[in-house]
Curated annotation (Swiss-Prot):
Responsible for synthesis of pseudouridine from uracil-13 in transfer RNAs. Gene3D superfamilies: TruD, catalytic domain (3.30.2350.20), TruD, insertion domain (3.30.2340.10). The keyword Transcription regulation does not apply. It comes from the Bacteria. It comes from Photobacterium profundum (strain SS9). InterPro entries: PsdUridine_synth_cat_dom_sf, PsdUridine_synth_TruD, PsdUridine_synth_TruD_CS, PsdUridine_synth_TruD_insert, TruD_catalytic, TruD_insert_sf, TruD_pseudoU_synthase. Keywords: Isomerase, tRNA processing. This is tRNA pseudouridine synthase D. GO terms for cellular component: cytosol. One of its GO terms (biological process) is tRNA pseudouridine synthesis. PROSITE patterns: TRUD, UPF0024. The active site is at residue 81. It is an enzyme of class 5 (isomerase). Belongs to the pseudouridine synthase TruD family.
Length: 352
């Protein structure tokens, strides 16, 4: 299978170690972190589930039937892959109704467990989560010694905050379609496809900017006019000049350099950084036209991603790796820096 991610640079050089990911669902475990407590009362029935072999939307539809409501009355914070063991909360709008008995629901769906239920005064919405915790078993490693060194590098310095291959579709089809749409080769009314192609377009441009900074050795080095964020904050500020103090803050991870999620408004960068980003974006005029035609607004995303709570344990030629990532970040971008996947490996939809 064509891996469009091969177009983008590795931070620590392309690994020589090969291995397999997710031969079985239990080799890939994902646990959602909402980051807030429930009220314990309210119109919304909250259900924590563990699922294997089922995707989130299927579970939502089946849970709606069990609760006697429409699927539109059931919501979630993030979609989780079917080819994994995943835990997440789902909310069901049940105003004035008692908590339903889910015994039959569980009995009829052997791939779904109900771990916990409670009540809340608000429904879950897509994006209502802090992040996800992952446990991944990487199997049949051909060079465990190299992988051990790369694990230390990743824990210390992080990985490129790339959007993963699943964002771009099989063989990059979502990007190909986005270019054609931007060139007015077809009209598109399907809301789901519009969202896929627009997300792919912005993600592709971000990855191109990030990859070029790695290639030129500037992923950790300030440019005049860079748009920066303090660690853990969303607000940006401009690097009007390069100072030793500011560069030291970047080296320590206290300040992050960002790259664009392109919109129809002007880039917030200036001087060298603005010229650098504009030159790369100009290479994809059809994607830029598509984004502007759809009036998407500019956002920023950090260049580097540092996994939290990162631990690992070798087991022969396998390694069990665990870490936490913020919402919107890809576990596959971490794994990509560690090994080259063997044929037969599968990807999880883990971007939410």
């Amino acid at each position: 299978m064509l891996n469009v991610m091969d177009k983008f640079c590795w931070l620590y050089e392309k690994p020589t170690c090969q291995g397999q990911i997710k031969a079985l669902p239990e080799h890939f475990i994902v646990k959602e972190n909402l980051g807030f407590e429930f009220a314990g009362k309210g119109e919304h029935f909250m259900v924590k589930i563990r699922k294997v072999g089922e995707n989130t939307k299927y579970v939502v539809n089946e849970l709606a039937k069990a609760c006697g409501v429409k699927s539109r009355d059931v919501s979630w914070a993030g979609l989780k892959d079917r080819h994994a063991v995943t835990e997440q909360w789902i909310s069901v709008h049940l105003p004035g109704k008692a908590d339903p008995d889910l015994t039959d629901f569980v009995a009829e769906h052997p791939g779904i467990e109900v771990l916990e239920t409670t009540r809340h005064d608000k429904k879950l919405r897509p994006g209502d989560l802090v992040g996800n915790w992952f446990q991944i078993r990487l199997l049949d490693l051909t060079n465990p010694e190299e992988l051990a060194l790369k694990l230390e590098q990743v824990k210390m310095h992080g990985v490129p905050n790339y959007f993963g291959q699943q964002r771009f579709g099989h063989g990059g089809n979502n990007v190909i379609k986005a270019r054609s749409w931007g060139n007015d080769e077809f009209r598109l009314r399907d809301k789901s496809k519009r969202s896929f192609y627009l997300s792919a377009a912005r993600s592709w441009l971000f990855n191109m900017v990030l990859s070029t900074r790695i290639e030129q050795g500037s992923v950790n080095s300030l440019m005049v006019g860079d748009c920066l964020q303090n660690a853990g904050e969303d607000n940006c500020f401009l690097a009007e000049s390069i100072t030793e103090e500011l560069q030291a803050s970047i080296d320590k991870g206290l300040v992050n350099i960002t790259a664009p999620l392109v919109g129809d408004n002007a880039l917030p960068t200036a001087a060298d950084a603005e010229a650098f980003e504009l030159a790369i974006i100009a290479n994809e005029p059809s994607l830029l036209k598509l984004i502007c035609d759809n009036r998407m607004r500019h956002e920023r995303r950090t260049l580097l991603l540092k996994p939290q709570e990162m631990e690992w344990q070798f087991d022969g030629n396998d390694v069990v790796l665990s870490f936490a990532l913020p919402a919107g970040c890809f576990a596959t971008s971490v794994v990509r820096e560690l090994l080259v996947e063997q044929e037969g490996s599968t990807h999880a939809n883990i971007d939410q």
